């Protein structure tokens, strides 16, 4: 863990602690935890019933993997799927009651013309023998994973009442080479690590990616000009804009919920303070003015205030200040080190990197019932950079493991953890993107 403040120390060192990797490789998922209390669900293989070439994507496998990694569900192993219905009329509910499954998903893939496919699927409550969901989706071959994630989202929401977040993306930073030959890349991938896309490459460090609320742009820090600078980049076109390159530190950008403003940490006056930039006029408003180090701003969901990390009390803690400025209030009191806040969509939960001695873990403060309660989400010793999924069901974070950087996603109740790892190399600085919209 970089101390006293993770982001500031990274800036002053001008170096990310990353080792060699192959940038072309995507992240792969390894589920390293599970929960016996997860809801049993059978996701039956969905065969291709067309006359052409079958899609390469195994739809049911993607749906099942999504549900598994949510921590809310436990899919029936393939070896125990004794019957393979493809439509509701073929389901023998007593079979699945005997196998103690609460739900069953069946479906099939057909041709839709012009190289596209049509997926029809149904969700059933096994105990009641009733259909809960029946939908059809059409997509070309290269979008079948997207369709699969959307199916998982619909199933998740129908059962839990919470919008699914499988059809989302994550951003992260990788690096290749060693010493002076280090090369950095800002990447975007699906939430399960597939379909990696390089957003920008640089011979200098890249830090702090942050998504615009519409998911179309990333703000990030680059050192390509010799000093830290903040850029906005369009993910689809690659067009980018330099928005902050003041003397000293330009860091930790964070889009406002309406996408019109950017919170950032600047030391243009000599000491790191929190500012807000109007992205239309580029006008700056200084929110804090303190001799302590103020950094790592992140917006409250309503856009009315900003959380940030400050050591003004002697040790790093999370504070909150109105988006228009004013006095700041301390938010965290549990432990001696709380930094890098991520706030859930409803503002009731705050995930932080929490330190004790030389150990840093991801912890969550939950204010759903009024008084704050704390839980530890990660078991590592150098865990940092928490980032909530848009539905707050999971938290993505960075860890050091075996001398290299990996990402983990943990369910917000800490029941299930999954590792997102490169076969050879490091990955850091994760940021979970917003919901996507079908066009």
Curated annotation (Swiss-Prot):
Coiled-coil parts of chain: none
Main location: periplasm
GO annotation, biological process: cell division; protein import
Keyword terms of this UniProt record: Cell cycle, Cell division, Periplasm, Signal
Cellular component per GO, a single term: periplasmic space
Signal peptide: 1-22
Subcellular location: Periplasm
Domain of life: Bacteria
A Pfam family the protein falls into: PD40
Free-text function comment from the UniProt entry: Part of the Tol-Pal system, which plays a role in outer membrane invagination during cell division and is important for maintaining outer membrane integrity.
Family classification: Belongs to the TolB family.
NCBIfam families on file: propeller_TolB
Subunit structure: The Tol-Pal system is composed of five core proteins: the inner membrane proteins TolA, TolQ and TolR, the periplasmic protein TolB and the outer membrane protein Pal. They form a network linking the inner and outer membranes and the peptidoglycan layer.
Protein name in the entry: Tol-Pal system protein TolB
């Amino acid at each position: 863990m970089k101390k006293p403040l993770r982001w500031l120390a990274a800036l002053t060192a001008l170096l990310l602690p990353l080792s060699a990797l192959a940038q072309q490789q995507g992240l792969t998922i390894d589920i390293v935890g599970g929960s016996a209390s997860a809801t049993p669900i059978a996701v039956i293989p969905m065969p291709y019933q067309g006359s052409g070439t079958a899609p390469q994507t195994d739809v049911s496998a993607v749906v099942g993997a999504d549900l598994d990694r949510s921590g809310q569900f436990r899919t029936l192993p393939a070896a125990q799927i004794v019957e393979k219905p493809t439509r509701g009329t073929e389901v023998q509910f007593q079979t699945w009651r005997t196998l103690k499954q609460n739900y069953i998903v069946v479906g099939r893939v057909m041709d839709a013309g012009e190289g596209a496919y049509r997926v029809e699927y149904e969700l059933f409550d096994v105990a009641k023998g009733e259909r809960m969901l029946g939908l059809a989706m059409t997509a070309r071959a290269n979008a079948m994973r997207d369709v699969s994630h959307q199916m998982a989202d619909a199933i998740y929401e129908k059962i839990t009442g919470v919008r699914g977040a499988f059809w989302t993306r994550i951003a992260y930073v990788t690096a290749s080479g060693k010493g002076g030959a280090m090369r950095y890349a800002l990447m975007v991938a699906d939430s399960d690590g597939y379909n990696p896309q390089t957003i920008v490459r640089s011979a200098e460090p890249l830090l702090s990616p942050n998504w615009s609320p519409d998911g179309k742009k990333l703000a990030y820090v680059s050192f390509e000009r010799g000093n830290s600078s903040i850029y906005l980049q369009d993910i689809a076109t690659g067009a980018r804009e330099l928005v902050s390159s003041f003397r000293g530190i330009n860091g930790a950008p964070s889009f406002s919920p309406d996408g019109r403003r950017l919170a950032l940490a600047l030391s243009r006056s000599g000491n790191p303070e929190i500012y807000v930039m109007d992205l239309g006029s580029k006008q700056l408003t200084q929110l804090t003015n303190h001799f302590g180090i103020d950094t790592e701003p992140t917006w409250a969901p309503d856009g009315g205030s900003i959380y940030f990390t400050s050591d003004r009390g002697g040790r790093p803690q999370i504070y909150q200040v109105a988006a228009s400025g004013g006095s700041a209030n301390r938010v965290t009191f549990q432990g001696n080190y709380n930094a890098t806040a991520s706030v859930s969509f409803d503002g009731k939960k705050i995930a932080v990197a929490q330190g004790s001695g030389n150990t840093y873990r991801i912890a969550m403060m939950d204010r759903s019932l009024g008084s704050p309660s704390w839980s530890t989400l990660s078991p590592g010793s150098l865990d940092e950079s928490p980032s909530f999924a848009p539905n707050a069901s999971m938290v993505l974070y960075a860890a050091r493991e075996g001398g290299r950087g990996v990402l983990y996603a943990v369910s917000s109740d800490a029941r299930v953890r999954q590792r997102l790892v490169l076969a050879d190399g490091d990955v850091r600085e994760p940021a979970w993107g917003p919901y996507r919209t079908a066009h």
